[in-house]
Amino acid sequence: EKDIQVIWGYLQVGEILSAPEKQKEAWWRPHSTDERTSGTANLIFKASERLSLDNTKPGAGLLPFDKKRVLTLEGATKATWAMNEVYDTQHIYGKRKNGAKDPIKGLYYAGIWQELGLMESDACTEWARSILL
């Protein structure tokens, strides 16, 4: 079977640590090292205590596999995601180019990254609710 990319966890941001002295207090995190905290682009995101969509759930957690959490476009390479307005180039933070072979059906963001910052919208909230709950 082909590899696929799947949403396997979530984190609702409760606090952003941007000051180096605050980052160093979180000594167990990889981004709290002197090498990381001496730069200007380092941030540490701490989870909220509870998930705002469902306050019975913690602010961060793991999710079991479910087809509704599969990002990969069917039949495509794992890094080509099915098109979704919520995470298209107009609705994410940062400048990314869609390099998919068929940009109408799929999204392909080149580069090494783990996180994708989505712009807040009603559509984003409903999408998050549909995959988390």
Positions of PLM-derived features:
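Contiguous surface segments at macromolecular interaction interfaces
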Residues: 3-8, 15-133
